[in-house]
């Protein structure tokens, strides 16, 4: 089976792809009847992010169900051992994203950094997933769109941590060398952790 990689496309084509995802996934809301040009409420930045997060969560849910049905990758306690070897992002109290102690700029910085850290795992998901390739690609691409939206919203982008290239190369090699069971386990853990991360992010976006 041949898999498509975003590295095969030019930056322009990739950017157009990201815009296409937003345009097709989130049509401009209009009234149910009458003049479509009147009474239209434009989406705010927070509204767009909320809808995009919900969209990604829906795709994650579909992929998790497919993995459970096809590969028996459901909620498995054995995966805890594999998870210890992964550096998947998660939100904590100190990140300022919870209702108690909420800090918008600190939270935005942490969510942006976390999504940046997820990218290598989501690229692996897109390249290696053996089920619904479109859903896998959509999770990777849509998360990139969300990342760009958050970068535009935040004021402290200098504080966003970008993964060290040499570390990413080493991690990529480690992921690529995995055998089938561990590869499926890594993908499932990535989906679970991203789902948790986005659910907390969604709550934070709603109070921004």
From Swiss-Prot:
Is Disulfide bond given among the entry's keywords? yes
Keyword Phosphoprotein listed: yes
Function as written in the Swiss-Prot or TrEMBL entry:
Cytokine with a wide variety of biological functions in immunity, tissue regeneration, and metabolism. Binds to IL6R, then the complex associates to the signaling subunit IL6ST/gp130 to trigger the intracellular IL6-signaling pathway. The interaction with the membrane-bound IL6R and IL6ST stimulates 'classic signaling', whereas the binding of IL6 and soluble IL6R to IL6ST stimulates 'trans-signaling'. Alternatively, 'cluster signaling' occurs when membrane-bound IL6:IL6R complexes on transmitter cells activate IL6ST receptors on neighboring receiver cells.
Any one GO molecular function term: cytokine activity
Question: Where are residues bearing Phosphoserine located in the sequence?
Answer: 77
Q: Any idea where this protein resides?
A: Secreted
Q: Which UniProt keywords apply?
A: Acute phase, Cytokine, Disulfide bond, Growth factor, Phosphoprotein, Secreted, Signal
Q: How does it assemble?
A: Component of a hexamer of two molecules each of IL6, IL6R and IL6ST; first binds to IL6R to associate with the signaling subunit IL6ST. Interacts with IL6R (via the N-terminal ectodomain); this interaction may be affected by IL6R-binding with SORL1, hence decreasing IL6 cis signaling. Interacts with SORL1 (via the N-terminal ectodomain); this interaction leads to IL6 internalization and lysosomal degradation. May form a trimeric complex with the soluble SORL1 ectodomain and soluble IL6R receptor; this interaction might stabilize circulating IL6, hence promoting IL6 trans signaling.
What GO biological process terms are annotated to this protein in UniProt? Answer: acute-phase response; glucose homeostasis; hepatocyte proliferation; interleukin-6-mediated signaling pathway; liver regeneration; positive regulation of cell population proliferation; positive regulation of multicellular organismal process; positive regulation of receptor signaling pathway via JAK-STAT
Q: List the disulfide bonds.
A: 68-74, 97-107
Query: Gene Ontology cellular component?
Result: extracellular space; interleukin-6 receptor complex
What family is this? Belongs to the IL-6 superfamily.
* InterPro entries cross-referenced by the UniProt entry: 4_helix_cytokine-like_core, IL-6-like, IL-6/GCSF/MGF, IL6/GCSF/MGF_CS
Its chief place of residence is secreted
Name of protein: Interleukin-6
Signal peptide region: 1-27
A Pfam family found in this protein is IL6
**Which species is the source of this protein?**
Felis catus
